[in-house]
Amino acid sequence: MTAREQLWYLINGVIDGSYEVKIFCDEFERIYNFETDKAQLTEQEKRGFEELFRMVARFSEFEEDLKIPNMYFSKEEILAKAKEVQSLRF
């Protein structure tokens, strides 16, 4: 499976509940940042994956963190962005 395919697999998995958001964020960040050849992505994928990457890198499951304005993203925000990115594919 290519890195691109792995990213889509993770997105589909977090949306359907196969992955917890924390695990999704860790894996998406690692694969996108270190294993993905961005030249192989479509323009829509580049934009969507980059936006999602910026969010997963700042995911927190702690309420205290989430109270800091414009710093961290919640589970709900990550899932909403994943669904938005998924909609770009179809």
Where are these regions (language model features)?
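Acidic, Ser/Pro/Thr-rich low-complexity regulatory regions
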Residues: 1-90
